[in-house]
């Protein structure tokens, strides 16, 4: 049987000094034979999705100790993409994912922890911790801080979120008073932003991967029911320890749970719910850490056969994550996919022997268990607060309408092709991605004129100055992992196109990425990126670009000979922006850029460079 990793520092005469230090943290004689479980928290007052996490690590710790473990909490960093958006702060967002993964590895391995509870929530924190969990491969369970309640105001008929505040601010026809009202109403509580943006998408995907508990992605942060998820996570961590160290059960480990089949399940869910395009980047990165051969071609294959069963903001103003929960949450979507034969239901989870068992227990349309039905009735209270578990409001009924409700069955899908797609062509040899869930069907095939910008900042200025017109394809390049560096999100350009009335009349192509709040014909992750010799660096103003989502293609409409000639010219000049960009690239960012791969590899470090 495997021995506790912690015995390295808790057993033997030569570890007297280490035990002395452990005792100084509060450990006693009887604790040295128990599993030491690390709690990776991510509390910070900078991020609304994490502002309420301060005491939640200790909530988990007390439960771990109650059921026979030793708990040791630490914190990692968390960047708020919305606050970092639109300035050089966004250069740090994606690189922070690697720092988070490293910091969890450093703490867990330095102190020989036996298991791990990951308390995450927002955009790069869940992916960073997921990468660490698969890298470490010790018993791990995820529990997130939960989604924010959607905002409300008398000035709008629909619920609000961050994107509404950004779009209204760029609308010249909106009064200052209306902008202020949207600003004050859009983000009313603690939690990750209320739509199917990156944070909520990733927290939902941990359910499909089998690494978190039912409801992890959908119970609002303010609801008392989420407290039970934290307590149960503590108990599950100890159970996983017993299963691995006491029984050598491989399904107690992240790599025994998050297998190739589990990654297919997660991506299938992602496509079905129209998740953020960033999830593709993060799943590819996590797969590499877990040594799972899951890549862009697998995503492309799945995107052609998985229907879209759920449509949530920013893809529609009608529904937010709180509405997904009322409809049965992620387990309900997985249930519909399973009935369509689209899942590997024999995959393991941290809370059930198989995904099939989990669905049977938690899908509200399959079970009569009143406890489960009550759980999914947990709803928003509409009271602004930064306090977790502060309300216990419940809907009067569940949304089980699978023909016209928030979650659909396959026969009544929003679209028979899913919400995400991979496009290939001479402008993106290794692929690029688009959230089809947010693209109006009238522009699924779009031919337009290239309007090229060498940075996001230049594109924003051009859009606001009305230099972009209907029929243009806005090309923003040298914003990839290396070229940015840091692969900025392009939320401001897409929001400003909307506010200018061009959301359905223009396309945007970039080697950068998009916020989970983006909608419209926004195509990101063009690979290879311009800084790595990608053909997006060869596009010129006035070129024609053809985008064909049904055919999964994107092409620069010039001859192969012209493309080769341009490449030779660019090779001679060097692959860098034509214009000097007023951008401070620090040593930390240069270190990230030096090792970063393009988006089709998850923008992770190039291990070939490290291994020499």
UniProtKB/Swiss-Prot annotation:
Necessary cofactors: [2Fe-2S] cluster; Mg(2+)
Record PTM N6-carboxylysine, positions in chain: 124
Top-tier EC class: lyase
EC annotation from Swiss-Prot or TrEMBL: 4.2.1.9
Role: Functions in the biosynthesis of branched-chain amino acids. Catalyzes the dehydration of (2R,3R)-2,3-dihydroxy-3-methylpentanoate (2,3-dihydroxy-3-methylvalerate) into 2-oxo-3-methylpentanoate (2-oxo-3-methylvalerate) and of (2R)-2,3-dihydroxy-3-methylbutanoate (2,3-dihydroxyisovalerate) into 2-oxo-3-methylbutanoate (2-oxoisovalerate), the penultimate precursor to L-isoleucine and L-valine, respectively.
Native organism taxonomy: Bacteria, Pseudomonadati, Pseudomonadota, Gammaproteobacteria, Lysobacterales
GO cellular component, one term: cytosol
Record note on quaternary structure: Homodimer.
Identification of the protein by name: Dihydroxy-acid dehydratase
């Amino acid at each position: 049987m495997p021995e506790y990793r912690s015995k390295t520092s808790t057993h033997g005469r030569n570890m007297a000094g280490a035990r002395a230090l452990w005792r100084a943290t509060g450990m006693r004689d009887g604790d040295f034979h128990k599993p030491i479980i690390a709690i990776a928290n991510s509390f910070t007052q900078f991020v609304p999705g994490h502002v309420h996490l301060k005491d939640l690590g200790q909530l988990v710790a007390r439960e771990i100790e109650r059921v026979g473990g030793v708990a040791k909490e630490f914190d990692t960093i968390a960047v708020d993409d919305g606050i970092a958006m639109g300035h050089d702060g966004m250069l740090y967002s994606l690189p922070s994912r690697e720092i988070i993964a490293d910091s969890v590895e450093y703490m867990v391995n330095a102190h020989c922890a036996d298991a791990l509870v990951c308390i995450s929530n927002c955009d790069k924190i869940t992916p960073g911790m997921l990468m660490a969990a698969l890298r470490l491969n010790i018993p791990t369970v995820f529990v997130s801080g939960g989604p924010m309640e959607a905002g409300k105001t008398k000035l709008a008929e629909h619920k609000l979120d961050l994107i509404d505040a950004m779009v209204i601010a760029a609308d010249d026809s909106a009064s200052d008073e209306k902008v202020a009202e949207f600003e004050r109403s859009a983000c009313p509580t603690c939690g990750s932003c209320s739509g199917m943006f990156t944070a909520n998408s990733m927290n939902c995907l941990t359910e499909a991967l089998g690494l978190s508990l039912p409801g992890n992605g959908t119970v609002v942060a303010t609801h008392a029911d989420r407290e039970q998820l934290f307590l149960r996570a503590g108990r599950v961590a100890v159970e996983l320890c017993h299963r691995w160290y006491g029984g050598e059960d491989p399904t107690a480990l992240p790599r025994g749970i998050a297998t190739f089949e589990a990654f297919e399940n997660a991506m299938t869910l992602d496509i079905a719910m129209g998740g953020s395009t960033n999830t593709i980047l993060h799943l590819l990165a996590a797969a590499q850490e877990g040594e799972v051969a899951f890549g862009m071609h697998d995503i492309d294959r799945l995107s052609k056969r998985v229907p879209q069963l759920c449509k949530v903001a920013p893809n529609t103003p009608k529904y937010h994550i709180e509405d997904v929960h009322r409809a049965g949450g992620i387990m309900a979507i997985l249930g519909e996919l399973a009935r369509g034969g689209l899942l590997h239901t024999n995959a393991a989870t941290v809370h059930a022997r198989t995904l099939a068992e989990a669905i049977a227990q938690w899908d509200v349309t399959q079970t009569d268990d009143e406890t489960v039905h009550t759980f999914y009735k947990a709803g928003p209270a509409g009271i602004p607060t930064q306090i977790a578990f502060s309300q216990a409001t419940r809907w009067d009924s569940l949304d089980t309408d699978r023909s016209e409700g928030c979650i659909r069955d396959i026969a009544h899908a929003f679209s028979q092709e899913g919400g995400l797609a991979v496009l290939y062509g001479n402008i993106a040899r290794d692929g690029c991605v688009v959230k089809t869930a947010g693209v109006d069907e009238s522009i699924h095939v779009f031919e337009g004129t290239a309007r090229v910008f060498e940075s996001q900042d230049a594109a924003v200025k051009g859009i606001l100055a009305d230099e972009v017109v209907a029929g243009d394809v806005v090309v923003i390049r040298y914003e990839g992992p290396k070229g940015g560096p840091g692969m900025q999100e392009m939320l401001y350009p897409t929001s400003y196109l909307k506010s200018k009335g061009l959301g359905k009349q223009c396309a945007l192509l970039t080697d950068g990425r998009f916020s989970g709040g983006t909608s419209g014909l926004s195509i990101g992750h063009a690979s290879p990126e311009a800084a790595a010799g990608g053909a997006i660096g060869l596009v010129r103003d006035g070129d024609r670009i053809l985008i064909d989502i049904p055919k999964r293609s994107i092409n620069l409409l010039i001859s192969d000979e012209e493309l080769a000639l341009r490449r030779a010219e660019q090779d001679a000049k060097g692959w860098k922006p034509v214009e000097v960009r007023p951008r401070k690239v620090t040593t930390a960012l240069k270190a990230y850029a030096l090792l970063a791969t393009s988006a089709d590899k998850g923008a992770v470090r190039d291990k070939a460079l490290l291994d020499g």
